[in-house]
Amino acid sequence: MPTYITLANFTDQGVRNAKDTLKRAEAFKDLAKKHGVTVKDIYWAQGRYDIVTISEAADEMAATALALSIGGQGNIRTETLRAFSAEDMKTTIGKMA
């Protein structure tokens, strides 16, 4: 399954409710399962982004549906990146002209 890295920032609402972030992370994992997405890791971070997740989804539509669903709750804004493993890159490079 494709791997995705999601970079998230708390909204004002998310910061006001920061004490609930661990509870929301568990709810996120449950929601992800409903979308067919497996959350591999969740990290809280310092710097430009507040949260980083690594997940696997069957396709872009599943990953996008999850991002829209979680964003609609109003606690975070997200940016999702498609990640490629070394094996993926080996295959890609092998297709180069």
Ranges and model annotations:
Residues 1-97:
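A compositional/biophysical signature of low hydrophobicity enriched in polar/charged and small residues
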